[in-house]
A protein has these predicted regions:
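Bacterial Sec-dependent N-terminal signal peptides
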Residues: 1-27, 512
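Structural signature of eukaryotic scaffold interfaces centered on beta-propeller domains
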Residues: 33-47, 92-98, 106-108, 142-159, ...
Length: 512
């Protein structure tokens, strides 16, 4: 079993139970199955069904065959659609936005993306193409793999889908820029595309931070030279209806250098952004951080409040932390998500990682390489009040897993990002309840020793101011396993058996 798959597992768990027995469904003649080809159909934070899109066994070398299946919340088949395409058209990822299912394809002959939308009866609603000629090669085939999948689609409920990629102005080492496209649900609605100014000479990357009723919030990370470790963050706000830029402001601070990690979009149109802060002149990709920051941002993109929680002064009240942000006997934390509950408490969900120094030295001597031996361990939840003062840190035990990565010359932040993009972490999701009074954290872990088939999925539930956790262990001969949202009290497990060319879906009851 390959470690890159498990970080892409995603499941939602809810606390009430509505069925005492698990349901099952089997899909046969499956040539290729991807985690992003299956997803939950969710209404009002409740799973009402599933879509499953996969490649069927080929009938000839020039044609690919696909099938889209729609299932209800009990895995009962509702509808399906089979279709064929030329060999040059490859499925990359699928997404659901509360109304439609979008499937993204890459046409290698024309070097373009093709987006097709389907309703919940598996009937095609629309189609759109976008040029992929200038897309960075690391992005161009993103998702076209059974491993290490990542997403370029962001669903926007009631509106459409956001597609975001990095493009090159010239060759492979030329300046890069972000391109963001809104593809609306309706053919009558007008989509839009936003790109960086053609005059920009920066090297840019980007990521969608959040969406509310008014704006898309996008993080632009810029550097002036290709190999520079001096990054600058900009918060871009785009009007969802028009695609026009509302603001594009640098995330700056008079006291510190900062690096943005995450954001929370508030219903009124404003945002809260979170990240790490450093010494003022530090190069954020390499330096050790001083702690976490929380800033409030208004509807014009201006920072209105600033709060800092340092490792040495604040976090050390709950954990033994060194001044460089390294937790004693633990290492560092990679923060996956920040969430806000109905009572305005803020929770930061992190996962432990560290370098196994002795193992790395032994590996280097043995292989004459600069590889690093890393370990991924426990889950951490930081609890803040509504002013971003740290109130508690909870630690949840998780099995230790080891892996080897190429040598990283940057600091803990760069190493954490590298592990994230490799899919090395066990974290899967954080899901708020409809009233935002409760949330669940999901993770999937298993023994990464070669040949091992033992794995488990775990959950951390927060309700009434308290945490509860659960783990369920399994032994399986499947090639890969994925976990998805389930009806109340359940998760849906998908197991892909490559040799047998089949996918087995089943619902499993949780111990809550």
């Amino acid at each position: 079993m390959k470690f890159a798959l498990k970080s892409l597992f995603c499941f939602v768990l809810l606390v009430s139970c509505s069925n005492l027995f698990a349901q099952n469904h089997v899909l046969n003649n499956v040539l290729v199955a991807r985690q992003k080809g299956t997803g939950a159909i969710i209404k009002d934070n409740t799973v009402t069904g599933y879509f499953a899109f996969y490649e069927l066994d080929k009938k000839d070398k020039k044609t690919k065959n696909y099938q889209l299946n729609i299932l209800d919340q009990n895995l009962t088949p509702l509808s399906n659609k089979k279709f064929s395409s030329q060999e040059n058209l490859s499925a990359m990822e699928a997404s659901y936005n509360g109304d439609l299912i979008m499937i993204k394809f890459y046409d290698s002959k024309e070097d373009k993306y093709v987006f097709k939308t389907y309703d919940q009866n598996a009937q095609q609603i629309g189609s759109k193409s976008l040029d992929a000629k200038k897309v960075a090669r690391s992005n161009a085939m993103q998702g076209n793999s059974e491993e290490g999948e990542s997403s370029t689609l962001t669903p926007v409920e009631g509106v459409g889908f956001i597609h975001a990629v990095v493009k090159m102005r010239g060759g492979a080492l030329s300046h890069s820029y972000n391109e963001i496209t809104m593809i609306p649900n309706s053919k009558e609605a007008k989509g839009w595309t936003w790109t960086t100014s053609e005059k920009s000479e920066d090297f840019e990357m980007g990521d969608v931070l959040g969406v509310n009723s008014k704006y898309l919030l996008f993080l632009e990370t810029r550097r002036h030279k290709l190999m520079s470790r001096d990054f600058e963050d900009f918060i871009l706000g785009i009007d969802l209806a028009t695609g026009k830029k509302v603001f594009n402001n640098a995330v700056e601070d008079k006291k510190y250098a900062v690096s943005t990690l995450n954001a929370i979009a508030n219903p009124g149109g404003d945002f809260q952004i979170f990240g790490l802060f450093f010494e003022k002149d530090a190069k954020t990709s390499k330096a050790s951080s001083l702690g976490l920051f929380g800033f409030s941002v208004d509807t014009l993109g201006k920072i209105t409040t600033r709060k800092y929680q340092s490792w040495a002064k604040d976090v050390s009240k709950f954990l033994k932390v060194k001044a460089n942000g390294k937790i004693e006997d633990v290492g560092y934390l990679y923060f996956h998500k920040f969430v806000k509950t109905a009572d305005n408490k803020i929770f930061a969900i992190g996962e432990q990682f560290k370098t196994n120094t002795g193992a790395s030295i032994a590996l280097s001597l043995l292989t004459q390489s600069t590889n690093q031996n890393m370990s991924i361990e426990d889950m951490y939840v930081f609890e803040f009040d509504n002013t971003f003062d740290l109130k508690n840190v909870s630690v949840f035990d998780k099995s230790r897993s080891s892996l080897t990565i190429p040598g990283i010359t940057g600091g803990a932040r760069t190493t954490g990002l590298f592990l994230y993009y490799m899919g090395a972490f066990d974290y899967s999701f954080t899901q708020l309840s409809k009233d935002k009074s409760k949330f669940s954290i999901g993770f999937v872990d298993y023994d990464k020793t070669k040949g091992s088939k033992g794995w488990y999925f775990g959950s951390i539930n927060y309700a009434d101011g308290k945490f509860k956790s659960d783990k369920i262990k399994y032994d399986t001969k499947a090639t890969s396993q994925y976990v998805y949202p389930g009806k109340p009290g359940y998760v849906m497990i998908s197991e892909y058996f490559k040799k047998e060319k089949k996918i087995e879906f089943r619902l499993e009851k949780l111990n809550f």
